[in-house]
Amino acid sequence: MSEKFEVTNLNMKSGMSLKIKGKIHNDVNSFTINLGQGKETLNLHFNPRFNESTIVCNTLDGSSWGQEQRENHSCFSPGSEVKLTLTFQDKDFKVTLPDGHSLTFPNRLGHNHLRYLSMDGLQISSFKLE
């Protein structure tokens, strides 16, 4: 069973990157990385889904999800080691995947300071904010 990793006092500002290393749990069909203001305000919900070979990104504002952005790209599998870089820019997020592919998702909520990070479905070995 996966455990959730959560940081509630993140100090991520525009121009900064978050580097994550970890191992995807063996018993999951997806994992998530969330960045935002709190559990109910997510500027970026990043959710690779293995059974669909798709990466889903979205925004949560209160109880309202935005329109999903789906990208058909598969470089993740249960039990694999991963390195990801999430770069927070004024107008968007850039996510660099383990295979070098990158995707961009708009900063729909417009915040310039992120306070919240959660990850689920991963065993984190390191994360670095720079």
UniProtKB/Swiss-Prot annotation:
Biological process, per Gene Ontology: cell-cell adhesion; positive regulation of apoptotic process; positive regulation of inflammatory response; T cell homeostasis
Q: Enumerate the UniProt keywords alphabetically.
A: Lectin
Cited Gene3D superfamilies: 2.60.120.200
The answer on whether this UniProt entry bears the keyword NADP reads: no
Keyword Nucleotide-binding listed: no
Domain of life of the organism in this record?
Eukaryota
Which positions fall inside the Galectin domain? 4-130
Which cysteines pair up through disulfides? They are none
UniProt GO MF annotations: carbohydrate binding; galactoside binding
UniProt-listed InterPro entries = ConA-like_dom_sf, Galectin-like, Galectin_CRD
In which residues is a beta-D-galactoside bound?
Answer: 65-71
Matching SUPFAM superfamilies: Concanavalin A-like lectins/glucanases (SSF49899)
An example GO CC term for this entry is: galectin complex
Q: What does this protein do?
A: This protein binds beta-galactoside. Its physiological function is not yet known.
Subunit structure, as described in the record = Homodimer.
Which PANTHER family would you find in this protein's record?
GALECTIN, GALECTIN-2
Protein's UniProt name: Galectin-2
* Originating species: Rattus norvegicus (Rat)
